[in-house]
Design a protein with these regions (language model features):
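N-terminal secretory signal peptides that target proteins for export/translocation
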Residues: 1-9
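Bacterial N-terminal signal peptides
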Residues: 14-25
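Sec/Tat signal peptide C-region and signal peptidase I cleavage site
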Residues: 26-33
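N-terminal secretory/targeting leader peptides
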Residues: 16-17, 34-123, 131-333
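Residue-level detector of alpha-helical hydrophobic segments embedded in or interacting with membranes
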Residues: 3, 24-25, 110
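Hydrophobic, aromatic-enriched, well-ordered structural segments
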Residues: 10-14, 29
Length: 333
């Protein structure tokens, strides 16, 4: 007569069988695919878009499509201030941001926004890949944003509806600035009337006379076609603010260490791609706007401009920690 196993013995057999299958890897369910939403203010073919698309591609490849990222280019998910808030809430998972809009949220971002701080692009990259980047990453994490890598954003210069050769020429002109107290004070120190506006409103505001000018790098001036309505570009190169490739802290906290390492590596690789693309695009953009008849005013002596920035430094680098960071950056070789 066949003896049926008792209930405890049947449970034991089932557990042993399950363990055996687990050893063979036969019962391991695949991890659920993650769908990430990303924000970018620029078009997909802009250097930042190229960098972000490289980032998402590398992550997909190294996770076997377990982490799938979709970047919404051209500010489809809102303007930058809105996108920052969405990332802090966790409704945007990753993004490329300019650091200036963080000036009122993350104190160390004020340092890299300070005018005439960097000698050249190489100096800026050494600073942001070193002490400045470390300080900013800590401050950003405190507000819910995890910095993974740093992108170039070029030297920012003035473009206006009439010629500007000296600070005196700016007096009384309405110049668009980013939403940042530092930028407002910077432009006011130059004698202009700072006008905070979303980036997406600059073209129509120039066209209608709401503002007399703005400031940005060559690729932004060209890609947005601002050169059609502001025909003078003065190479003040007053600022060289880097940008951050970041993820939401809420999303980051749900990742294991292996996936975090994949994202960090992918971000660094994407930054190298973005920086190469940026250097190439700067040259092309300058050639395009020059060919379109823009008057380029070369500012070779920036001393009269930088001399006006003392009150800005006194206000935004007065804190001992920030003053020390400014010194570190200036001493970098």
């Amino acid at each position: 007569m066949m003896i049926k196993p008792t209930r405890p013995r049947r449970a034991l057999f089932a557990a042993v069988a399950a363990a055996a299958l687990g050893v063979l890897g036969l019962t391991a369910a695949p991890a659920a695919a993650q769908e990430w939403r990303g924000w970018n203010i620029h078009a997909a073919d802009y250097p930042n878009g190229v960098g972000m698309d490289a980032f998402t591609r590398i992550v997909a490849e190294r996770t076997n499509n377990r982490i799938r990222m979709r970047t919404f280019h051209s500010a489809q998910l809102g303007q930058q201030d809105e996108a920052i808030q969405q990332m802090r809430l966790g409704t945007i998972d990753f993004a490329n941001f300019n650091l200036s809009p963080f000036n009122n949220l993350a104190p160390s971002t004020n340092v890299v926004t300070l005018p005439f701080l960097f000698r050249d692009v190489g100096h800026m990259q050494r600073a942001i890949d070193g002490p400045a980047g470390e300080a900013i990453a800590r401050d950003l994490e405190n507000i819910g944003i995890i910095a993974l890598a740093w992108y170039d954003a070029g030297a920012r210069s003035l473009y206006t509806t009439r010629a500007v050769r000296t600070p005196a020429d700016l007096r009384g002109m309405k110049i668009r600035v980013q939403t940042s107290d530092l930028w407002i004070d910077l432009m006011r120190a130059l004698g202009a009337n700072p006008t905070p506006l979303p980036f997406g409103e600059v073209f129509t505001s120039l066209q209608s006379g709401v503002i007399d000018g703005a400031e940005n790098n060559w690729p932004s001036y060209e890609s947005t076609r601002h050169f059609e309505v502001a025909r003078f570009y003065s190479t003040t190169e007053h600022s060289n603010v880097p940008e951050v490739l970041a993820v939401s802290r809420q999303r980051w906290q749900r990742l294991n260490e292996a996936d975090r390492a994949i994202l960090r590596d992918a971000a660094r690789e994407s930054a190298a791609i973005q920086r190469r693309s940026w250097a190439e695009r700067e040259q092309v953009s300058r050639q395009r706007v020059t060919a379109a008849g823009v008057t380029v005013i070369e500012i070779t002596d920036r001393a009269p401009w930088s001399a006006l920035m003392e009150p800005v430094y006194a206000k935004y680098a007065a804190d001992a920690r920030l003053a020390a960071l400014v010194r570190q950056i200036r001493e970098l070789r």
